[in-house]
């Protein structure tokens, strides 16, 4: 997997991986701004990767960023392993570099953002994961810019 400064221009897609849903965000490396894109609400592998293939075809990203789920203290758990596997599959299937980014608290932040604009309860579900992906990507941009 590339380091955080491997791409300097072009479209970037980010993923908030979950067993049931995958949030997707998009941004331009040069602008360093992330935006929520969509949520893939599917637990089966084949339909998930078909949707991702459609997004990659449409947006032609130069880099993919996958949120790496870890405990608050940084230790890994079952979902961490699944996130790493998902990242390897993306890189292998689409031949696009993949970076891993810390995703701690992104769902909490996304929930808070939605509550601030009056979206609560079950109404959050369709947007929550893509906003979490947006925060993953924005953090990636912020950290990669700070490192350069």
Swiss-Prot record:
It is found in: Cytoplasm. GO terms for cellular component: cytosol. GO terms for molecular function: nuclease activity. One of its GO terms (biological process) is rRNA 5'-end processing. Keywords: Cytoplasm, Hydrolase, Nuclease, Ribosome biogenesis. The keyword Cytoplasm applies. Transmembrane segments: none annotated. Its EC number is 3.1.-.-. Gene3D superfamilies: YqgF/RNase H-like domain. Belongs to the YqgF nuclease family. PANTHER family: POLYNUCLEOTIDYL TRANSFERASE, RIBONUCLEASE H-LIKE SUPERFAMILY PROTEIN. NCBIfam families: RNAse_H_YqgF. Could be a nuclease involved in processing of the 5'-end of pre-16S rRNA. This is Putative pre-16S rRNA nuclease.
